[in-house]
Curated annotation (Swiss-Prot):
Record lineage: Bacteria, Pseudomonadati, Pseudomonadota, Alphaproteobacteria, Rickettsiales
Secretion signal span: none
EC class of the enzyme, as a word: isomerase
Pfam families tied to this protein: DnaB, DnaB_C
Protein name: Replicative DNA helicase DnaB
GO BP terms: DNA replication, synthesis of primer
Role this protein plays: The main replicative DNA helicase, it participates in initiation and elongation during chromosome replication. Travels ahead of the DNA replisome, separating dsDNA into templates for DNA synthesis. A processive ATP-dependent 5'-3' DNA helicase it has DNA-dependent ATPase activity.
Catalytic activity field: Couples ATP hydrolysis with the unwinding of duplex DNA at the replication fork by translocating in the 5'-3' direction. This creates two antiparallel DNA single strands (ssDNA). The leading ssDNA polymer is the template for DNA polymerase III holoenzyme which synthesizes a continuous strand; ATP + H2O = ADP + phosphate + H(+)
Classification via NCBIfam families: DnaB, PRK09165.1
Domain of life, source organism: Bacteria
Biological source species: Rickettsia prowazekii (strain Madrid E)
Any one Gene Ontology molecular-function term assigned to this protein's record: ATP binding
Amino acids binding ATP: G221, R222, P223, S224, M225, G226, K227, T228
SF4 helicase domain location: 190-482
Subunit structure, interactors included: Homohexamer.
Length: 486
């Protein structure tokens, strides 16, 4: 649809010039040439591409390279580096450098000029992003959803805000010690000494001390071991434990985010209801419920509805889309912990043909999300089929698919293993002498799931045995067969 143009001189299109400040660029360059020490004050945030004038980009780049070599950037050394450059010749570079030095005599605070140059560069980038977004919207095919374009634009804008002027730098050790002591004091006041987000499982908390902010935790296992079920239990427990802690400390309630790339949100919530109401999920799917069970179901459904638990079941998300959505949830719902089911279903951004490189990009992206949003990120992962070829089916770090990069980027790697699953498939013939021995082994591992902590960057590794009720996919403390109530 074409709108009628308003015939008004005030509304005529006026050519617009990209924002820049050539004089600020000249004065800063002259000041640095006069006093090379000034480069260290601006080089942390200012790069050569932030300059508007191409010749200024080349001069700044040459200054950096000369100083990096341990030399002094002067008109003489700069001329020797740029003498073959066509643009430098065109503007009679030697005289231009002298002009820059003359202009620097008026500079009072060169850092301010650097910030002006940087700010104007960001505005130009903002204009470029805006034009790109508009052009993409006009030219995109029906195959590209508007939502994808919005996420792309949001990611571009967010990346722009993270560029350059970053206030976080070196921290004096005294400040870090104060923060560490505060954390230790909080742990001393907790009877359970859990300093992170409690998993709701005592023995697991004793090993991990809870889930910690900025940690990437990998939960891996073979199919039918209960990875998703365990993740749902952990998500529910952490959601409830964060809520109780936030209420106690009079803080804004934190939320749980769950990216379900394999199951639909309906399937996931059916599992949640089965877990909480202790009703078999088959009965929930078929609707074969007694009045008593239905009333129990309604009660648990009302309780779950009040929790800050958010599910995103969009399939085949890219690591970039996950980052964008997690940032949005942090802003809107105070995201406290993030679960992703599962890692191998995430798409990389670079679309590398090498799957190992793509997984590396994904795991590094997940770790970056954990650090940036200051939350624990729990990502589920598959294990290779090599496990099934061994007599001993207990997983090892080498069983992780594309294991090198996953193991390297993760702060914690946990495996879920249920010996009961394998034993039930090896039942000898009834009455056979080996049957009694098999039955004895089965009784020892019945309803038990082992959580093998194979890597723990800041704590002990080892095995934690949990009680597992396969009927309701419910995990609890083994010793007393107890569960974290919600």
């Amino acid at each position: 649809m074409v709108r009628n143009k308003i015939n008004n001189d005030d509304n005529l299109s006026i050519p617009r010039v990209l924002p820049s400040n050539i004089q600020a660029e000249q004065m800063l360059l002259g000041a640095i040439i006069t006093n090379n020490a000034l480069l260290s004050y601006v080089s942390e945030f200012l790069r050569n591409e932030h300059f508007f004038e191409p010749i200024h980009q080349k001069i700044y780049d040459a200054i950096e390279k000369i100083i990096e070599k341990g030399l002094i950037a002067t008109p003489i050394t700069l001329r020797s580096m740029l003498t073959q450059d066509a643009l430098f010749k065109e503007i009679e570079g030697e005289g231009y450098l002298a002009k820059l030095i003359t202009m620097s005599m008026m500079v009072i605070n060169p850092i301010d000029y650097g910030k002006i140059i940087y700010d104007l560069a960001i505005k130009r980038n903002l204009i470029n992003i805006g034009e790109e977004v508009v052009n993409n919207a006009y030219n995109s095919s029906l195959a590209v959803a508007a939502k994808e374009q919005i996420e792309y634009a949001e990611a571009k804008l967010y990346d722009l805000t993270k560029e350059g002027l970053n206030e976080k730098s070196f921290t004096k050790v005294g400040i870090s010690i104060s923060e560490s002591l505060a954390s230790i004091n909080r742990a001393m006041k907790n009877n359970d000494h859990v300093i992170g987000i409690s998993t709701g499982l005592l023995d697991l908390d004793n090993k991990l001390f809870g889930f910690h902010n900025s940690d990437l935790i990998i939960l891996a296992g073979r199919p039918s071991m209960g990875k998703t079920a365990f993740a749902i239990n952990l998500a529910l427990n952490t959601c409830n434990n964060m809520r109780l802690k936030n209420i106690r400390d009079n803080q804004e309630i934190k939320s749980v985010g769950f990216f379900s790339l394999e199951m639909s949100s309906e399937q996931l919530t059916t599992r949640l209801l089965s877990l909480c109401a202790e009703i078999d999920s088959t009965a929930l799917r078929t609707g074969m419920l007694s009045e008593d069970k239905y009333n129990r179901l309604r009660k648990e459904a009302n309780t779950l509805s009040e929790l800050q638990f958010f599910i995103d079941d969009t399939p085949a998300l890219s690591i970039s889309a996950i980052r964008t959505r997690a940032r949005r949830m942090k802003r809107k719902h105070n995201l406290g912990i993030l679960f992703i089911d599962y890692l191998q279903l995430i798409r990389g951004v670079s679309k590398s043909e090498n799957r190992v490189n793509e997984i590396s990009e994904i795991t590094q992206g997940l770790k970056a999300i954990a650090k940036e949003l200051n939350i624990p990120v729990i990502a589920l992962s598959q294990l290779s089929r090599a496990v099934e070829l061994r007599e001993d089916k207990k997983p090892m770090l080498s069983d992780l698919r594309e294991s090198g990069t996953i193991e390297q980027d993760a702060d914690i790697v946990m495996f879920i293993y249920r010996e009961e699953y394998y034993l039930t498939r090896k039942e000898p013939v009834a009455g056979d002498a080996k049957h009694a021995e098999w039955l004895d082994k089965l009784n020892k591992v019945y309803n038990i799931a082992d959580i093998i902590i194979a890597k723990h960057r800041n704590g002990p590794v080892g095995n934690v045995s949990l009680y597992y009720d396969s009927q309701f996919s419910k995990f609890g403390n083994l010793e007393k067969r107890t569960f974290n109530s919600i």
